[in-house]
């Protein structure tokens, strides 16, 4: 319709939008040099093979015939809009329930944090130089670096301090702890602060995705911990079912949280330099731009 060919796959997981000539299954009529265009009367197949030609009514320039810079912008737009969608979902969630600043609510006796001088009300700014905006940043950093010495930069009454500690293993918790608690959500003071912490939320999930990929490569997690499409759909269904008793708004907030996670994860995965993904195609386009030729 209108020069666009629509299709529904047997397994409708995910989706895609391809420019004319972007799919290797399409054959161009004649040469596909820069500036070549489509023949509106070209049939859908060549009549001899199953190779696809142009959709009826398609006009314009082939994807591979335009400049490398134009193709770069088209390919990178997909992952970028994954991150933009994640940001909008984060904006909705934070507007409804607030955010969790990296502030210490309490310090447990006998743990490294108390011994190093941390107090309730302190705000942790960096762990080994890594900036922390959310309390979850603190939690995940310690989770991904168990038992390792950590330099903590924190703020108290407007003044910056630095201390060092080594997380201690807790038999009760089954993991390494420094002995602090936090994660109390706070409503944003303004629209600007909501937008700011929406960015930090997306940043958090991007960092978690990269850290998780590192754990997979190091074989620190099993294949059972990796969720495929079926498991993701099941998780969404479970989330909706468990949230229904709390009202529609809680259901929407939980679904938006899932959307942040999935969109940020998909954006990162698509940028990986693997041939079948957008990242792999970007590598070849960048090489073409550097060389000045395909």
List the predicted regions and their residue ranges.
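Membrane-embedded helix-turn/re-entrant segments that form the catalytic/gating core
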Residues: 1-89, 186-189, 194, 285, ...
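Functional transmembrane alpha-helices
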Residues: 53-69, 167-266, 283-294
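Pore domain of cation channels
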Residues: 73-84, 257-271
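Hydrophobic membrane-targeting alpha-helices
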Residues: 88-96, 267-271
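Alpha-helical transmembrane signal-anchor/signal-peptide segments
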Residues: 97-114, 119
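Juxtamembrane/interfacial segments flanking transmembrane helices
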Residues: 100, 228, 272-285
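Conserved PDZ fold ligand-binding element
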Residues: 113-135, 202
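PDZ-domain C-terminal substructure recognizer with occasional recognition of PDZ-binding tails
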Residues: 119, 125-126, 140-182
């Amino acid at each position: 319709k209108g020069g666009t060919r629509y299709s529904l796959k047997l397994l409708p997981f995910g989706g895609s939008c391809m420019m004319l000539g972007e799919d290797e299954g399409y054959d161009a009529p004649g040469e596909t040099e820069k500036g070549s265009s489509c023949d509106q009367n070209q049939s859908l197949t060549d009549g001899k093979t199953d190779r696809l030609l142009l959709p009826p009514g398609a006009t314009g320039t082939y994807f591979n015939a335009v400049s490398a810079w134009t193709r770069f912008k088209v390919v990178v737009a997909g992952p970028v809009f994954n991150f933009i969608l994640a940001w909008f979902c984060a904006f909705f969630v934070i507007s409804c329930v607030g955010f969790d600043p990296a502030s210490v609510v309490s310090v447990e006796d006998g743990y490294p944090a108390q011994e190093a001088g941390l107090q309730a009300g302190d705000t942790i700014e960096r762990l080994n130089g890594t900036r922390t905006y959310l309390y979850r940043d603190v939690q995940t950093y310690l989770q991904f670096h168990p038992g390792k010495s950590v330099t903590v930069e924190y703020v108290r009454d407007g003044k910056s301090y630095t201390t060092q500690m080594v997380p201690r293993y807790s038999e009760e918790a089954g993991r390494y702890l420094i002995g602090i608690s936090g994660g109390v959500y706070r409503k944003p003071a303004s629209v600007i602060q909501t937008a700011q912490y929406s960015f930090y939320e997306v940043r958090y999930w991007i960092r978690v995705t990269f850290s998780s990929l590192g754990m997979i490569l190091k074989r620190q997690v099993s294949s059972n911990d990796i969720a495929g499409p079926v498991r993701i759909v099941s998780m969404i269904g479970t989330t909706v079912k468990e949230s229904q008793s709390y009202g529609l708004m809680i259901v929407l907030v939980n679904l938006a949280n899932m959307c942040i996670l999935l969109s940020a994860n998909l954006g990162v995965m698509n940028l990986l330099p693997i041939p079948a993904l957008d990242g792999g195609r970007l590598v070849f386009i960048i090489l073409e731009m550097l060389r000045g030729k395909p």
